[in-house]
Amino acid sequence: MNHFIRTAIVAAAVAVSGSAIVAAQTNPMVGGAAMYPTKTIVENAVNSKDHTTLVAAVKAAGLVETLSGPGPFTVFAPTNAAFKKLPAGTVDTLLKPENKTQLASVLTYHVVPGTITAADIAAKAKANGGTATYTTVQGEPLMFKKVGTGWGIMDGKGHKGRITIANVMQSNGVIHVVDTVMLP
């Protein structure tokens, strides 16, 4: 009987730890950091070494409180490399206090209200001739088209990029990592 109880306890412990491992693996690593679906967009983003420029910009624009709120939000999060693709001096100029409004406009152009997964983008694209269009918090649209096995993103000016990591679930929405800064 003792052996049976010990075996049952060990089996239960393995089952619980196994499900915890599976739960932890549902979100991809981003910028070398684990992303936790129980944390907010800001709480997770600050841990990504690939998003230090974005985090600095969110702070400079005064959007930390908003993106820490209940949302839900879908954030198309440009990497540091995406910001480096902008013309020289652009990021430094945007981060200046006198350009806070312009910076907020650029950043909110990367945010769509609600939780929109890659499956949602796919369904909308399928229903609309291959293109999914979403209106951003900034007020202008972002367009998405299938590119290979992933999704391309395009702003209203024709700048194109790709979603490089999709469906990073957050407590207040979802992040999709993108390789290009979209400009309103």
Predicted regions and their residues:
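Bacterial N-terminal signal peptides that target proteins for export
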Residues: 1-9
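Bacterial N-terminal signal peptides
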Residues: 8-19
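Mature, structured domains of secreted/extracytosolic soluble proteins
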Residues: 21-184
